[in-house]
Amino acid sequence: MGNWVVNEGISIFVILVWLGMNVFLFVWYYRVYDIPDKFFYTRKLLGSALALARAPAACLNFNCMLILLPVCRNLLSFLRGSSACCSTRIRRQLDRNLTFHKMVAWMIALHTAIHTIAHLFNVEWCVNARVNNSDPYSIALSDIGDKPNETYLNFVRQRIKNPEGGLYVAVTRLAGITGVVITLCLILIITSSTKTIRRSYFEVFWYTHHLFVIFFIGLAIHGAQRIVRGQTAESLLKHQPRNCYQNISQWGKIENCPIPEFSGNPPMTWKWIVGPMFLYLCERLVRFWRSQQKVVITKVVTHPFKTIELQMKKKGFKMEVGQYIFVKCPVVSKLEWHPFTLTSAPEEDFFSIHIRIVGDWTEGLFKACGCDKQEFQDAWKLPKIAVDGPFGTASEDVFSYEVVMLVGAGIGVTPFASILKSVWYKYCNKAPNLRLKKIYFYWLCRDTHAFEWFADLLQLLETQMQEKNNTDFLSYNICLTGWDESQASHFAMHHDEEKDVITGLKQKTLYGRPNWDNEFKTIGSQHPNTRIGVFLCGPEALADTLNKQCISNSDSGPRGVHFIFNKENF
């Protein structure tokens, strides 16, 4: 139990608090509309659907307040960089911002469904009551407001039968129009956010996500017409519903039961979302300001396996290891921004990214940089690009541990390129405050060509550690997870050579996936009473495996070995 708490305790606590707030708001506002006399006659007209519509509306306000905060990248980076308010454990929660963003989005979808279905029943009953297709009591309540100097309870004033009457409400009432619009926006945003769409049609995901602007505008004005109505406080003093409701025919004729007066609830949603909307507006202004700063591409390198490297310079640009940036190339698309991990080290006088060509945008950038041509390209022909960032990630904490495991899958090795480069520079400069004592590096890749661009860095590190008589500092395992029979025969023939046939390194390439259980047990036995940071940039399936290994191989007590799992999310 203790090892589970070390890795997941704070995350579970945050989720439980969030779920608890949703339950509290739902129950509280359900009772607000289901018990007080203010809504006594509204309940007589609408039944339990009134409370079932308003309770999820309160939860929607709460979650729509939260949904923007996890995507305020500059705010999160500021919090992450403030050691005074963020310990390592708190920063790990900030690294799960996108996971929380998705959870909040699904909660919004759930409450939207409940809210919409309940209001569909409300509209049907209100329309039926106006066309005398309901019980006499509801009809009598709906007729209040037809005479001069009366305030109405039933917001439907036209006498049009269903389904035409319901459609009329949807296209003439502000709540109906905005409800349809924001629900459609939500459906498009959620359906375009699936993994398949994001990976294969990123542009669709990118553009539909910007429907959030329409969503929040519609949400802010959704309740402006105040169609949910209740009895006024002044009217309740003169007309007590529980004493008068059985004598509806005598209302206005006897002193203790005058005709009740009704008013609509003031809109509240804007009060919930105005703060986050302001923060997000500031976020976008900062991004716009950064995007206008000049970026110079100093070098473009074409690597094997459809990968290019961009080396750039920007005035005032400062970075930490493992951070990422957003890149826009107006020649390819004037609006799209794409995230890329920085592969350079803070000690270098430029910053770089490695881009794998996998979609329309990256293909366009590949051609814009002249990488599809054989001849050398002049620097002035390179496209202009905009850069936003850098932004913090889990990998920033790598120097907070004495022992770390770095696991990269495929192009997921990029953040660790930055880390390993920085380690190399620190050793060259004999950095006195380097806490890190041991690195276990794992790289899993399907294709042999993918290793080529990274091998030079590993060779430099290998040589440096030998010169410093510290070959034990870095232990790396390069795992080839895909090969055919001819390759296997070739590897076997050269197995006894001094250097690896694929990477040129002294450390031999391994074939197949690591036995993670053995790896964790071996590392744990070599470093007792140590907090070991486990950093992954790779697929969710591998993340689940490593997270379970961290939990199962950590000691339950405060002493002993503890594996702390961290995953890149951007």
From Swiss-Prot:
Residues that, per the record, bind heme b 2: 115, 222, 226-227, 268
A family per Pfam: FAD_binding_8
PROSITE patterns: FAD_FR (PS51384)
Sugar-bearing residue positions: 132, 149, 247
Topology feature Cytoplasmic, residues: 2-9, 73-95, 195-203, 286-570
Record's comment on post-translational modification: Glycosylated.
Cofactor names: FAD
GO BP, sorted A to Z: defense response; inflammatory response; innate immune response; monoatomic ion transmembrane transport; respiratory burst; superoxide anion generation; superoxide metabolic process
Domain FAD-binding FR-type, first and last residues per copy: 287-397
Enzyme Commission designation: 1.6.3.-
Keyword Oxidoreductase part of the UniProt annotation: yes
GO MF entries: electron transfer activity; FAD binding; heme binding; metal ion binding; NADPH binding; protein heterodimerization activity; superoxide-generating NAD(P)H oxidase activity; superoxide-generating NADPH oxidase activity
Domain Ferric oxidoreductase: 54-286
Reactions the enzyme catalyzes: NADPH + 2 O2 = 2 superoxide + NADP(+) + H(+)
Residue positions binding FAD: 199-200, 337-339, 341, 354, 356, 361-362
Location relative to the cell: Cell membrane
Positions contributing to NADPH binding: 411, 446, 481, 513
Subunit-level organization: Component of the phagocyte NADPH oxidase core complex/cytochrome b558 complex, composed of CYBB (heavy chain (beta)) and CYBA (light chain (alpha)). Component of the phagocyte NADPH oxidase complex composed of an obligatory core heterodimer formed by the membrane proteins CYBA and CYBB and the cytosolic regulatory subunits NCF1/p47-phox, NCF2/p67-phox, NCF4/p40-phox and the small GTPase RAC1 or RAC2. Interacts with NCF1 (phosphorylated form). Interacts with NCF2; the interaction is enhanced in the presence of GBP7. Interacts with RAC2. Interacts with RAC1.
Role played: Catalytic subunit of the phagocyte NADPH oxidase complex that mediates the transfer of electrons from cytosolic NADPH to O2 to produce the superoxide anion (O2(-)). In the activated complex, electrons are first transferred from NADPH to flavin adenine dinucleotide (FAD) and subsequently transferred via two heme molecules to molecular oxygen, producing superoxide through an outer-sphere reaction.
Name by which UniProt lists this protein: NADPH oxidase 2
